[in-house]
UniProtKB/Swiss-Prot annotation:
Residues 352-371, 469-479 have a biased composition (Pro residues). InterPro entries: Shootin-1 (IPR024849). GO terms for molecular function: actin filament binding. Residues 17-100, 141-184, 259-349, 480-504 form a coiled coil. Residues 372-383 have a biased composition (Low complexity). Disulfide bonds: none annotated. It comes from the Eukaryota. GO terms for biological process: actin filament bundle retrograde transport; axonogenesis; Cdc42 protein signal transduction; cytoplasmic actin-based contraction involved in cell motility; endoplasmic reticulum polarization; netrin-activated signaling pathway; neuron projection morphogenesis; positive regulation of axon extension. This is Shootin-1. Belongs to the shootin family.
C-alpha cells in the first residue's frame, strides 16, 4: 500500500512537472510573440517620428515663405500709396496753375494775348495731354500687374494656410498615435514584467517539485535496499535453521539420548546467544538507518519550508507594494474630495458678515443647602455614624490659627476625626450625581472644591472596601493605605492653602498630626445633632 501511494505521488509529481514545462513553453512562445510585436511597434513609432520631423521642416519652410510674401505685399502697398499720393499732389498743382494762368490772362490786354503764340501753347498742351495719357495708362498697367500679383500671392497664401492646417491635423493625429503606442508599450511592458514574475514562480515551483521527486526517489531506493537486505537476512536465517534441524536429527540418530540432549541444549544456548546478538545488531542498524532517513526528511522539509517562506515573503512584498499604491491613491482621492467639498461650501455659502460674539456665560447657581440629605454626602456619613456606635476610636486634630478653644471646636475635631477614620476604613459614600447634574459646569477653571471631591473619590476607589462577610468592628488601617491617604491629604491641604491663603484660617485643619484614641460610646441626641450641624458647616466651608 505504501509503495502504491508513493508511486501515485511520483506520478502526480511527474504530471505536474510536465504541465509546468508545457506552461513554461507556452509562456516563452507568448513572450517571443510580444517581443516581435514590440519591435514592429517600435519601427512604426520611428517611422511616425521621421514623418513628424519632415512635416515640421515643411511647415517651417511654408511659414518662412508666407512671411516673405507678406513682407513683399506690405512693401508694394506702401509703394502704391506713395504713388497715389504723388499723383493727387500733381493734379492739385496743375489745377492751381491753371487757375492762376486764367487770372493773369484776364488781367492782360488783348494785344498781349494776341501776341502770345497760341500754337506753342497748343503744342505744349498736346504734349502734356499725351504725356498725361501715357502716364495714366502706364499707371493702370502697373496697378493691374500689382493686382494680379496680389491675387496670386493671396491664392498661394490660402493654399499655404490650408497646407498648414492639414499638417497640423496630421501632427495631432500622429501625436495621438504616438501616445496610444506609448500606452500600448507600457501595457506590454507591464504584462511582460508580470509574465516574468509568473515564469520565476513557475521555475521555483518546478524546482520544488523536482526536489520532492528526487527525495521520493531516494526514499524508494532506501526502502528497496532495506527490503532486499531484510529478505537476504531472512533467507540466511531459514537456511541456518534448516542446517541446525538436520544436524540435530543426525546427532539424535548417532548419539544417545542424554548426550544428544546435552549437546542440543548447548548448541541451542549458543545459537540463541548468537541470534540475540545478531538481532540487536540488526535493530541498531535499522535504528541508524531510520535516524538517517528522518534526518534527511527533516532537512528536506526544512528546505521546502524555507522555499515556501521565500515565496510567501515575495508575495507579501508584492501585496505591501499594492497596499502602498492603494493608500497613496486613497490619500489623493481624499485630498481631492476635501478640496471639492471646500469649493462647494464656498460656492453654496458665500462669505457673510462676522458672527456676533457669544453671550457671556450665566452666573453659577447658588450652592445647595447643607441640610439636604439627598444632595449632601456628609449627611449619609453622619447617618452611618449614628447606626454604627460600636466604633471606639477618636482622632485629635490640631487646627491652625485657632485662638479660642470652645466645646464646639472639640466636637468639630471629633466629627472630622471620625469622618477621616471612616474614609480610611472604606466607608462607601453615596454618589453625588444629582448635584453634579443640577449645577451646569461653566467655562471656569477647576476650583479647590472640585479638586477635593475628585481626590475623595480617588481615595474611596483606591482604599479596599470591606466585604459582606467582614465583621462590623473597627479594622486598623494598613501602612500602604495610610501612606496613600496622607499623600492625598497633603495634596488637598496644599490646594486649599493656595486657593484660600488668608480667608478662613480656622477651617484649614492640620491633618498630618493624626492620633488614634478611644471615643466614649454613650452620646445623647443633643450632642449628635450638634455634631451633625458642625460637621456640615465645616465641610460646606471647605467645599465652598
Amino acid at each position: 500500500m505504501a509503495s502504491k501511494g508513493k508511486k501515485n505521488k511520483v506520478r502526480t509529481n511527474s504530471d505536474l512537472s510536465n504541465q509546468v514545462l508545457l506552461q513554461y513553453e507556452s509562456l516563452q512562445k507568448e513572450h517571443e510573440k510580444i517581443k516581435k510585436e514590440c519591435k514592429k511597434l517600435q519601427e512604426e513609432r520611428d517611422e511616425a517620428l521621421r514623418k513628424l520631423n519632415e512635416f515640421e521642416s515643411v511647415s517651417h519652410r511654408v511659414i518662412e515663405e508666407v512671411n516673405s510674401i507678406q513682407e513683399n505685399l506690405e512693401i508694394e502697398k506702401t509703394c502704391r500709396e506713395s504713388v497715389e499720393a504723388l499723383a493727387s499732389k500733381l493734379n492739385r498743382q496743375n489745377l492751381s496753375l491753371k487757375r492762376k494762368s486764367m487770372l493773369y490772362m484776364s488781367r492782360l490786354a488783348a494785344d498781349v494775348v494776341a501776341e502770345i503764340s497760341i500754337d506753342d501753347e497748343d503744342d505744349e498742351d498736346a504734349h502734356e495731354e499725351e504725356a498725361g495719357v501715357c502716364s495714366s495708362s502706364h499707371c493702370h498697367i502697373v496697378i493691374t500687374e500689382l493686382r494680379d500679383k496680389l491675387e496670386e500671392i493671396l491664392a498661394t497664401k490660402k493654399q499655404l494656410m490650408i497646407d498648414l492646417e492639414t499638417t497640423r491635423e496630421q501632427l495631432s493625429k500622429t501625436r495621438q498615435e504616438l501616445l496610444k503606442e506609448k500606452h500600448d508599450n507600457t501595457v506590454l511592458i507591464a504584462e511582460t514584467f508580470q509574465q516574468k514574475k509568473l515564469l520565476g514562480k513557475y521555475n521555483r515551483v518546478s524546482q520544488y517539485a523536482l526536489d520532492e521527486f528526487e527525495s521520493l526517489q531516494e526514499d524508494l531506493k532506501l526502502e528497496r535496499d532495506l527490503r532486499s537486505e531484510a529478505e537476504k537476512f531472512a533467507h540466511e536465517m531459514l537456511i541456518e535453521q534448516k542446517k541446525l534441524k538436520r544436524q540435530s536429527q543426525v546427532l539424535v540418530q548417532s548419539i544417545s539420548v542424554g548426550e544428544a540432549l546435552q549437546k542440543a541444549l548447548a548448541e541451542i544456548s549458543t545459537l540463541t546467544h548468537t541470534l540475540e546478538k545478531q538481532r540487536l545488531e540488526h535493530q541498531q542498524q535499522v535504528k541508524g538507518l531510520e535516524e538517517q532517513v528522518n534526518s534527511s526528511e527533516v532537512k528536506k522539509q526544512l528546505t521546502a519550508l524555507q522555499r515556501q517562506t521565500d515565496l510567501l515573503e515575495e508575495e507579501r512584498k508584492e501585496w505591501q507594494h499594492k497596499h502602498t499604491k492603494a493608500e497613496t491613491e486613497a490619500k489623493d482621492l481624499r485630498f481631492t474630495v476635501e478640496e471639492l467639498k471646500k469649493k462647494l461650501q464656498q460656492v453654496s455659502n458665500p462669505p457673510t458678515a462676522a458672527p456676533a460674539p457669544p453671550p457671556p456665560p450665566p452666573p453659577p447657581p447658588p450652592p445647595p443647602p447643607p441640610s439636604s440629605s439627598s444632595s449632601n454626602p456628609l449627611s449619609s456619613l453622619l447617618s452611618i455614624l449614628r447606626k454604627k456606635k460600636d466604633v471606639s476610636t477618636e482622632i485629635a486634630l490640631v487646627e491652625k490659627d485657632s485662638s479660642e478653644k470652645s466645646p464646639e471646636k472639640d466636637v468639630r475635631q471629633q466629627a472630622v476625626d471620625e469622618m477621616m477614620l471612616r474614609i480610611k476604613k472604606g466607608v462607601q459614600l453615596r454618589p453625588v450625581s444629582q448635584t453634579t447634574n443640577r449645577v451646569r459646569p461653566g467655562p471656569k477653571e477647576p476650583t479647590a472644591s472640585n479638586s477635593a471631591i475628585q481626590e475623595l473619590q480617588g481615595i474611596l476607589n483606591t482604599v479596599k472596601r470591606p466585604g459582606p462577610s467582614s465583621s462590623p468592628g473597627p479594622r486598623p488601617p494598613s501602612p500602604s493605605e495610610k501612606s496613600e491617604l496622607e499623600k492625598a491629604l497633603q495634596r488637598r491641604r496644599e490646594a486649599v492653602k493656595s486657593a484660600k491663603n488668608n480667608t478662613n484660617p480656622s477651617s484649614v485643619v492640620d491633618l498630618t498630626q493624626i492620633k488614634q484614641t478611644r471615643s466614649e460610646p454613650g452620646q445623647n441626641t443633643g450632642d449628635q445633632e450638634t455634631l451633625r450641624h458642625t460637621t456640615t458647616t465645616i465641610c460646606t466651608e471647605q467645599l465652598s
